[in-house]
Each structure stands twice: as structure tokens, then as C-alpha cells.
Amino acid sequence: MDLHPSSYHDSLEELWDEEEEPEEVETVMKVVPSTYQQYLDVFSKVKAEKLSPHCACDHHIELEGSLPPVGVIDSLCKKESDRLRAYISENLEKGFIWPSSSSTGAPVLFVKKKDGGLHSCVEIRKLNAVTRKNKYPVPPMNQLLNVFNGSSIFFKIDLRGAYNLLRIKDGDEHLTCFRTKYDSFEYLVMPFGLTNAPASFQNLVNDIFQNLLDVYVVVYFD
């Protein structure tokens, strides 16, 4: 695994324009009914793990006060170090993060999974504490259920890596910086755990389905 700058993609556009892997197409075709195979690209794991372009719904981080304090880099055992290196490598490869020189930075913590593995997570509570809250309206569940009245056929669409499909607003990336013993990095996509992330995602999906809301589509996140 190479964490040096020479291993980064030369341009974000190059990463976005990579062609679909034939093996991935074959895998998707086996599980997608023939009726929907004209839309194979929307089922693609490869495309879901590429950096999305900026859009009007990019996640904006507005601070109410000063920058959160810089987090402490804790000592790690070998298992934690291996997991951290894998996380950094995976997200650099996808184009979801890049090196940062931000004057702030959150530490990385590890949570044990049921299978004994480790889940790495950025401790961003101090950033959330100084972020202005987005009061985007979220429809109550009873209103969503009322739309179903009289319907008998339902489809559920679940988005792969949902939050990571949304970009951080240009210029706000440095606020998402996390510090490690290898380097500091910042997110180009909206990571899980950010305050206002649910509101930003609801706004994005509502914008996509604007003309179909409460006609054929309801949007709900849990």
C-alpha cells in the first residue's frame, strides 16, 4: 500500500471517467431482472465507489464559532494500525479523501465489530458542536404512510454508500480533516456522523424526485 502523493489520482475527472469493469457488469446482470437491465449502471458498485461531481446540494458546513481544537493522535496497536492504513488506502483510491494541511483535525477511533474486526470512525463531535444546525424539514412518518393509502404494489430503493454520494461543498473540505500518525486527510464526500448530514441527504433526494414526491415516490431515511 502506497500512501505517498505519487499514488494519488492526477485529477478527479480521471477517476470519475473510468470505464466500467466487465466483471462487475456480469455480476450485476446475474441479479438484475431482464426488464431493468437497460438501467444496469445504477446498480453498479464500481460507479457507487467513484467520486461524484459537485451539485447544488453539496453539504455545507457553517461554523457558529471558532474552529474545533486539534485532536490528539493516540498510540495504536498493530491491528488498529493495519485497519487505519486500509481505511486510508481504500478512500484515497476512491478519491473520497486527500491529504490535508488544515489547522484543525479530529482523531480517529476504533469500534469493535461483532465479528471481531475493527470499524474506524472519525471523532467529529467537537466539529458538530460548533456547526450551525440545518433545520431542513423532514416529513413525519404518519404523513408518509398516508401516501400509501390505496396502493398495493411497492418498490424500495436503497442507495449504496448513500452519504458518500454527496460532495462536501468546495472550500469546506478542510473542516472535515482527521489526523493520523501517517498524515492528515480531509473528506471530499460527506462522511457518516456529520451533523446536518441527514438534512443534506434528504434535500438531495427530494431534489432528484421533486416532481414525483407524494405521487409515486416517498423519501425516508432511518
Task: State where each predicted segment sits.
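An acidic, Ser/Thr-enriched, charge-mixed low-complexity segment/SLiM signal
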Residues: 1-22
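Generic low-polarity alpha-helical segments
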Residues: 1-3, 32, 205
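General helical secondary-structure elements
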Residues: 12, 79-81, 156, 175
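Alpha-helical interaction segments
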Residues: 5-6, 25-33, 168, 191
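Reverse-transcribing Pol proteins
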Residues: 15-138, 215-222
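Reverse-transcriptase-like RNA-dependent polymerase core
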Residues: 41-70, 111-119, 134-136, 142, ...
